């Protein structure tokens, strides 16, 4: 897909004949808040609109540093990408009737970072009145990669500017932002991953510029908001795939490679737990290895490989998704939960990677 800063468009599909008062489904794509587009063939909404007699909407939103640069000042207040989504939801409320949709029957849904985005709109006072239902696939705002503390976000924005060469006054963030505005978008894209410490914990699931608790759109830590019952109290659908972790493991975890069967032994398995979760102490590593070992199938050479899939996928994708479902149930709402386990027949990845993220 060609890259352009002129990207803030949305797509609308309506069934034929044109409906009146139809349900509206608004899709938010994933991609770690640094990649993605609504124009992928897999996101073509015409089939869903036709088969289910609904109006389907998707939108683009700014990504990476261009969408989530944060300085704590008006020069770069953060979460521009989420505000793009918010603006699209406002547009739906104001215009969807012209396409046969009912602004009172809007469901927002998304996958991965798109699911976290859906959850942020459920939490944000700015967005709660712009939809009625929500579906989240393979993530939520409770994922450890989905939101960053404001000070870390500020430091990463500073590091990006300095890495590009905007170091005239490191303490004046507005000056740094003004300098960044003078460089090309491609230059910013080329440098934004340099702010990630590859030796840090969770680097496989780290994102250089995720959403930030800005005090405006994201007013509090998502976990604290759920604990306090401060969220849009609605029925939801949440789900995940059977093999959430495998997609990530082939990007550097010892023993894993898309060109092999990635068979590992117990020693490698334990070492990979440390590799994926380096902040765990020795006791927790051993307990994790014990918990995820399939003791009834010790004779299967794929057992440790499959176990590490869950060791990585559970904390980053499955558990945060389930936690949101449980929170809504605890508040008397209904949460529908699914696991997607079907492996695509035309999967371009090795079959052992399964139904992956």
Swiss-Prot record:
UniProt keyword annotation of Nucleus present: no
EC number: 3.1.1.8
Active site residues per record: 112 (acyl-ester intermediate), 244 (charge relay system), 357 (charge relay system)
Similarity field: Belongs to the type-B carboxylesterase/lipase family.
Catalytic activity: an acylcholine + H2O = a carboxylate + choline + H(+)
InterPro entries according to UniProt: AB_hydrolase_fold, AChE-related_enzymes, CarbesteraseB, Carboxylesterase_B_AS, Carboxylesterase_B_CS, Cholinesterase
GO molecular function: acetylcholinesterase activity
GO cellular component, one term: extracellular space
Record carries keyword Hydrolase: yes
Matching PROSITE patterns: CARBOXYLESTERASE_B_1 (PS00122), CARBOXYLESTERASE_B_2 (PS00941)
Keyword vocabulary terms for this entry: Disulfide bond, Hydrolase, Serine esterase
GO biological process terms, semicolon-separated: acetylcholine catabolic process; choline metabolic process
Cystine bridges: 166-179
Sections of the chain in a coiled coil: none
Protein name: Cholinesterase 1
Species in which this protein is naturally found: Branchiostoma lanceolatum
